[in-house]
């Protein structure tokens, strides 16, 4: 009897994982339709104080939106990574400024260490009542949407490319991250 229950639970878990993976895959391409006041770029890994490709793609997409629409501030997020001497947010700001973004238009949030904190702390800077465009890689869109809704952030999503070398890994990892997010919400740790 116990074996049947365990098998059933495993089947339910696998079915749920497949459904979540499909949601992640089919929500990977987003373009905004409104006029946000701020762009939030969640942090990602850096190497030698420079954004790695996933973060560069996010920043390139934010820059693209900024150059076309202007009149927005960009909030870069992320604390200092292990082995780095500046924060992810500062590395991102430096990259955007090197592309031609006015330094006064980039605000850094340098304390967040995960996606939930990225969004929460960034929206605290300008206020939850503002409208945000959140720019991240395609694999991240579904979870960012869930977190933003949970935190009460008015938002739209703008998806950046995902580097090919991390594509499969990140899409699979995202399902685990969604399960973890659900666990944190249920246990009140968000």
Question: Where are the predicted features?
Answer:
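A structural signal for short, hydrophobic/glycine-enriched beta-strand patches
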Residues: 25-172
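A transmembrane-helix-recognition feature enriched in membrane-embedded lipid enzymes
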Residues: 167-190
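N-terminal membrane-anchoring alpha-helices
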Residues: 1-37, 184, 190
């Amino acid at each position: 009897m116990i074996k049947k229950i365990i098998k059933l639970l495993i089947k339910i878990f696998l079915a749920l994982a497949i459904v979540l993976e499909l949601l992640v895959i089919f929500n990977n391409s987003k373009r905004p339709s409104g006029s946000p006041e701020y762009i939030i770029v969640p942090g990602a890994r850096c190497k030698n104080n420079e954004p790695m490709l996933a973060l560069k793609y996010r920043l390139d997409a934010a820059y693209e939106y900024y150059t076309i629409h202007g009149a927005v501030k960009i909030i870069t997020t992320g604390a200092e990574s292990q082995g780095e001497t500046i924060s992810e947010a500062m590395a991102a700001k430096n990259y955007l400024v090197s592309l031609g973004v006015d330094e006064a238009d980039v605000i850094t949030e340098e304390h967040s260490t995960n996606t939930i904190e990225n969004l929460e702390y960034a929206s605290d800077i300008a206020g939850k009542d503002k409208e945000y465009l959140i720019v991240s890689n395609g694999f991240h869109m579904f979870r960012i949407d869930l977190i933003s809704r949970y935190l009460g952030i008015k938002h739209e999503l703008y998806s950046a490319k995902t580097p090919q070398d991390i594509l499969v890994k990140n899409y699979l990892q995202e399902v685990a991250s969604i399960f973890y997010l659900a666990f944190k919400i249920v246990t009140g740790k968000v």
